[in-house]
Amino acid sequence: MTRFIHDRFAKEYLSEMLSPIGTVNIGRDVTSEVREIDVYFTPGTAIPEYSSSLGLLGKMAGTTAIFEPFRNPASASEICSCLGKLLDVRGDKERKFRRENTRSDDEQLPKLWILVPTASKALIDSFNAKPDTENWMQGIY
């Protein structure tokens, strides 16, 4: 359940922008406990020109992804909660691969995108986040 207008707007905006290039689930439950993923995206048929027009969001949507948008700077606790959701989903997928006796690689597992307007250096350092300037622009960790 979305409590704030920004949360609803962010979820609906991401859904509208990503739906032409894949499947978007708003408010997907995580089974370990009742926690909700804001936006779970699975790429569909590629539309390169549309993805390109989305810029950075289009690049992020190149793989299965969890999007967790925040209106204000996220706290360490909120980031840990997002990481917990990612680990739960990855665990579910890995168990499914084992049950089906199929091989998995990191490309089949979702990526986590925590979207915040700002993050302090102390917060970034506390998670040992490092920029990947070869693949992403400044500000992406």
Each language-model region and where it sits:
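Elongated, amphipathic alpha-helical interaction scaffolds
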Residues: 1-141
